[in-house]
Regions:
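N-terminal "arm"/small-domain region of PLP-dependent enzymes with the aminotransferase-like
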Residues: 1-31, 36
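Short beta-strand segments
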Residues: 5-7, 58, 130
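Generic alpha-helical secondary structure signal
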Residues: 14, 18-22, 36, 40, ...
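Alpha-helical structural signal
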Residues: 16, 23, 61-64, 83, ...
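Solvent-exposed, non-membrane alpha-helical residues enriched in polar/charged side chains
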Residues: 20, 24, 42-46, 65-69, ...
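Phosphate-binding glycine-rich loop
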Residues: 29-78, 92-103, 168
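Active-site His/Glu-centered metal-binding helix of metallohydrolases
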Residues: 45, 157-158
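PLP-dependent aminotransferase-like
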Residues: 69-157, 164
Length: 168
């Protein structure tokens, strides 16, 4: 017996015609990266997130790399994260030229804020918590630690888009 993990055909059946129409439109005008659909997505996603701007990139990996580089993270720096995530949460740190420092997770499988301060060194530049399975990390505790030590925080939300934390 074969039981599919996720039946994507069934899941998308109700909107199949709309999906085909949208894909056909993009294929016809050929603007895969900078077309009006991307601009519309950015506008709507920014509104959904309650921010002024959103920038669509080719991957979450590149988004994290750009965020780290924009903050000046590079060679000789350390970034605290967790190891129980997709490879991007670590590879982005390496691609930025820094060293990932792992802290363990709590019973909720999310970054354990109680372990962060023990991992901080003079080379620590940022904390990269990974929100996972639709659940956000304890951001109040993480932000308090970051503020105390003057560290940047880059949140990997790829697995928890639109997740709420304390009503936000």
């Amino acid at each position: 017996m074969n039981i599919p993990y996720v039946d994507l055909a069934e899941q998308h059946a109700p909107i199949k015609e709309k999906l085909l129409e949208a894909v056909s439109k993009v294929l016809d005008h050929g603007k895969f990266v900078s077309g009006e659909e991307v601009a519309e997505f950015e506008r709507r996603f920014a509104k959904l997130c309650g921010v002024q701007y959103a920038v669509a990139l080719n991957s979450g990996t590149d988004a994290l790399i750009l965020a780290l580089k924009a903050l000046g993270v590079g060679s000789g720096d350390e970034v605290i994260t967790v190891s129980n995530s997709f490879v991007s949460s670590t590879s982005c740190i390496v691609c930025a030229g820094a060293k990932p420092i792992f802290v363990d997770v709590g019973e909720d499988y999310l970054m354990d804020p109680a372990l962060i301060e023990k991992a901080i060194t003079p080379r620590t530049k940022a904390i990269l918590p990974v929100h996972w399975t639709g659940r956000p990390c304890d951001m109040a505790a993480i932000m308090a630690i970051a503020k105390k030590h003057k560290l940047a925080v880059i949140e990997d939300c790829a697995q928890a888009v639109c997740a709420e934390y304390r009503g936000q």
